[in-house]
Amino acid sequence: GMPVAIGAAIACPDRKVMGLIGDGSAMYTVQSLWTMARENLNITVLIFANRSYHILRGELTNVGVGNPGPRAIDMLSLDRPALDWVQMAGSMGVEANRVTDCASLEAALEDGLATDGPSLIEVVL
């Protein structure tokens, strides 16, 4: 997650760090973006935006809830209101891009890895 990426960037300031995280999990530590910007850490974060707390759906299955009701499913949605990771990152001082296809992802990764300081790529799934 993002806090681990911060730790890695502080431990190895001469290396680029990549953080990979889902949008639901990232919501638990969104303030990490501000820390990345404040400390000018050399991190590129990829947010995999499936617009859901999908990991919690798996946990429902793990505890025997094979077919959750519509209210439970609604509680796992991150689209009301929709999250805008580009806007959130920008408001905390982190450059960000949104990508929806492989070609755009490749270009955004090249930019993120070539640029010093923090950046974020919202990968819309």
Q: Which role does the model predict for each range below?
A:
Residues 1-125:
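Thiamine diphosphate
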